[in-house]
């Protein structure tokens, strides 16, 4: 069983297949991503779907859109089948839904069920909510077996990390919860954290109360359109699967994760004023971390770390108010929405901008306005958004053609002007922020034979203005190819190749010399799941090269890694897994990645450079239906250095080991 999610009582292969697919996508999205993102909310929601599957006879379009392996046409056909033929009597009626292929059905089965729906059902009574609602408490403790240099005199707290999460929910109707977190090195019930945890998140979310489709109080997240104006949700991107290039609007959602930046605090609501028209409004007022000098905000601090006095001085340094709304019309094959947002800083934001960032956000207030749209004509689906603001504009369009359930084509065009500002916008691109980027992306996915699947994509992009380590306007290419072979349910393998070409300043020339860089990545992965076992072997090869400052000699660097993963689920409620990784790279540019199973609602994809190996062991024990205990131990051993890290994070010696523990109580 995948530890980051928890599955209902179905066959091992059925529950593992969609979870392994999700692991693959998250791993690919993590690799090379400059912006760290925690997937806690998304993983928690999918885990809840495994325990409380969606009833297909009462499913809404938004509920089905949370499953990335379902296409828009499959969702519409599934809803139409229930509308035309009435309630399903068995889950196997999925085979009768047009465009629903066997592979998709296998992926969907763990998340759905079929139950009779009574006519005239309304919002549940308070008595039912209190009686049948479910409570969950999740406690986590991380213990490092090393001492960083910062603990000698700079870090203000102990080296332990711990968090506590409580959630009460009743189906999709009501969710209430609180989250507290203390990072390693932060004080606890002391100094600037006299109230205990360094970070707290409170949330209250009601859904489907008559015309009131959603009401959020406390901390919440927002996503509308394609993210050009507003998205604090998990963003999809370029992977070896077409499903991760599509984005479905999340609307208003709770914020229960330990992410200390990507959320709003206040009130938000969505009302269905007409059968086909929804109106949303929101207001947020929150303190944010940053540096304030002479009454001006010079930088925004996003990490949430407050370990040293210097970091603590950045805590709650200024306030940000946000107000805005969205109006969405959706009927049949047409969907049109308008989103607007206005930001107010309590003092001027004047960052000390480098030349490559001279057009970035600054000022005391600004706005964004955008219009998103979606239209389906036969097998064509057109989705897009156009946005503008205080500066610049952005445009994104996707055209997808579904020849059948086995053949798909996708074309994406994006134009993000170099001076377009958005504080909480994320969208498709080489970087997640929709600014200073233009490009065309073409992808094709085909399953011509029962056991074979092919994917290929080509992204040609350009940056109209400078970027970090690129001291001129530049361009690049990103090409991907993957072939997957699945001879039987318990055995699958794939090979993929990725080629990326970009321009970059030559090291040591201060930007005076800029040459292309060429990056080749190859991966082979074999997964075998006999009975209660899972075996997975991964082999990676990286090749990185750039011409020297004179343009004559290529500087070549290489990296390798081999990872072996094994897990076993006992007949009683105990599962164990072990993983070992060997890596050998020439430098940071040729670094490799190896994902590991983490604790519940977490995902871990560390990068490695240099020479060494890492091993980890994971254990899960369900003491009863109410209590679950997880533990993970891991150690990395470097063979080419005597210290790990630098500055306050420096660790003496060549070994880094830690123990993570988690206890969940459900009732």
Label each PLM-derived region with a short phrase.
Residues 155-159, 264, 316-351, 358-667:
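Exposed, low-structure sequence patches enriched in small/polar residues
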Residues 1-12, 667:
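Bacterial Sec-dependent N-terminal signal peptides
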Residues 181-199, 253-260, 313-316, 544-554:
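Outer-membrane beta-barrel proteins
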Residues 60, 71-74, 101-104, 171, ...:
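Residue-level recognition of beta-strand termini and adjacent short loop/turns
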Residues 194-289, 403-422, 573-588:
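Outer membrane beta-barrel
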Residues 275-282, 286-323, 328:
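Internal alpha/beta core interface subdomains
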Residues 236-247, 292-309, 597-602:
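Surface-exposed loop/turn segments flanking beta-strands in extracellular/periplasmic regions
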Residues 7-205, 210, 219-223:
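Compositionally biased linear targeting/interaction segments
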């Amino acid at each position: 069983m995948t530890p980051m999610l928890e599955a209902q009582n179905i066959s091992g292969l059925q529950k593992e297949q969609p979870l392994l697919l999700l692991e693959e996508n998250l791993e690919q999205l993590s690799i090379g991503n400059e912006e760290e993102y925690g997937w806690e909310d998304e993983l928690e929601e999918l885990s809840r779907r495994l325990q409380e599957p969606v009833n297909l006879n009462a499913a809404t379009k938004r509920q089905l859109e949370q499953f990335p392996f379902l296409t828009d046409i499959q969702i519409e056909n599934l809803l139409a089948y229930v509308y035309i033929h009435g309630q399903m009597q068995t889950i196997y009626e999925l085979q009768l839904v047009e465009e629903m292929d066997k592979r998709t059905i296998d992926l969907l089965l763990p998340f759905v069920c079929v139950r009779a729906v009574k006519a005239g059902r309304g919002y549940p009574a308070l008595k039912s909510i209190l009686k049948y609602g479910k409570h969950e408490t999740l406690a986590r403790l991380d213990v490092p077996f090393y001492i960083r240099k910062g603990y000698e005199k700079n870090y203000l707290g102990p080296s332990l990390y711990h968090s506590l999460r409580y959630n009460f929910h009743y189906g999709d109707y009501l969710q209430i919860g609180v989250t507290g977190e203390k990072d390693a090195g932060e004080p606890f019930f002391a100094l600037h954290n006299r109230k205990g945890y360094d970070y707290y998140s409170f949330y209250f979310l009601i859904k489907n109360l008559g015309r009131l489709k959603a009401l959020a109080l406390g901390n919440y997240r927002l996503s509308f359109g394609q993210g050009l104006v507003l998205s604090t949700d998990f963003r999809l991107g370029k992977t070896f699967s077409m499903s991760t290039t599509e984005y479905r609007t999340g609307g208003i959602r709770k914020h229960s994760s330990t992410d200390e930046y990507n959320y709003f605090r206040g009130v938000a609501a969505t009302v269905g004023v007409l059968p086909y028209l929804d109106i949303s409004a929101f207001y947020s007022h929150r303190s944010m971390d940053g540096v304030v000098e002479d009454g001006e905000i010079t930088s925004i601090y996003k990490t949430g770390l407050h370990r040293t006095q210097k970091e603590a001085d950045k805590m709650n340094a200024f306030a940000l108010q946000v107000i805005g709304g969205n109006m969405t019309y959706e009927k049949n094959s047409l969907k049109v929405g308008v989103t607007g947002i206005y930001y107010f800083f309590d003092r001027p934001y004047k960052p000390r901008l480098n030349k490559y960032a001279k057009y970035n956000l600054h000022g005391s207030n600004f706005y964004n306005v955008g219009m998103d749209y979606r239209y389906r004509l036969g097998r064509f689906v057109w989705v897009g958004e156009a946005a503008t603001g205080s500066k610049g504009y952005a445009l994104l369009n996707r055209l997808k053609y579904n020849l059948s359930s086995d053949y798909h084509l996708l074309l994406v065009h994006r134009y993000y002007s170099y001076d377009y500002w958005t504080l909480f916008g994320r969208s498709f691109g080489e970087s997640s922020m929709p600014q200073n980027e233009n490009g065309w992306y073409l992808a094709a996915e085909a399953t011509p034979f029962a056991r074979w699947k092919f994917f290929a994509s080509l992204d040609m992009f350009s940056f109209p203005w400078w970027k970090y380590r690129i001291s001129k306007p530049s361009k690049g290419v990103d090409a991907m190819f993957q072939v997957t072979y699945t001879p039987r349910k318990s055995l699958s393998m794939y090979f993929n190749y990725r080629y990326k070409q970009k321009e970059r300043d030559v090291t040591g020339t201060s930007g005076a010399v800029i040459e292309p860089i060429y990056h080749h990545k190859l991966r082979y992965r074999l997964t075998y799941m006999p009975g209660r076992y899972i075996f997975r072997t991964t082999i990676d090869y990286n090749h990185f090269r750039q011409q020297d400052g004179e343009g004559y000699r290529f500087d070549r660097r290489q990296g390798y890694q081999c990872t072996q993963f094994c897990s076993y689920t006992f007949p009683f409620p105990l599962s164990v897994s072990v993983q070992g990784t060997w890596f050998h790279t020439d430098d940071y540019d040729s670094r490799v990645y190896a994902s590991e199973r983490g604790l519940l609602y977490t995902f871990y994809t560390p990068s490695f450079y240099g020479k060494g190996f890492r091993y980890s062991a994971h254990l899960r024990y369900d003491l009863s239906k109410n209590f679950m205990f997880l533990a993970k131990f891991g150690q990395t051993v470097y063979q080419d250095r005597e210290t790990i890290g630098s500055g306050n994070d420096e660790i003496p010696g060549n070994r880094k080991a830690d123990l993570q523990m988690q206890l969940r109580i459900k009732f």
